[in-house]
C-alpha cells in the first residue's frame, strides 16, 4: 500500500518559498502558474500534500484521501527538470492528481475500491486513464476515498462510506456526509 496519510509524513519537506494557497486554483491557473514559473511542481505538490495532512486525518478529519504516493515529490522534481529544460511532456506535466480508489495504478498504491477485502491489491498495469496521465507528466498524488465498491453494494448503502477510508465528511458542514 502507498504511504498512509499522517501528520508527520511531510516533515522533511519544508517549503523554499511561502506556502502556496491552492484552494482557489483552477486547472488553467495551475497550468499557467507552472508554465510561467510562478511556482514549481514541487511547490504545488508540497502544498497539496500539506493540505491533505491538515484536513484529511487531522484537523476536521475529512477522510477524503485513503493514501498518498510516497514518490510524489520525486516525480514533481523530475517534472520541474523537464520544464527547466523546455521539454515538458504536455501542459499537464507536473500537475498533481488524485485517483478514485477504484482506478488501477501500477505504483505503490493499492486499488481497494474502498473495501478491506482488497487491502494490498497491487496491480501490474495502469488503467488507460492513468497511463495517459503519466504520459502527459501528471503526478499521481494518491487515492481518494469513495463509496465502497463505487456504491454497488446495495440500494440502501451509505454514500461516501468505505471500510478502508471511513465516511467522507462534507467539508462545509462537518456533521453531514459529503454526498
Model-derived segments and spans:
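Residue-level signal for the start and early helices of compact helical domains
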Residues: 13-21, 25, 30, 53-59, ...
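N-terminal, positively charged, Ser/Thr/Ala/Gly-biased leader segments
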Residues: 58-118
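An N-terminal boundary/leader segment
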Residues: 1-84
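Short glycine/serine-rich loop/turn segments
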Residues: 92-179
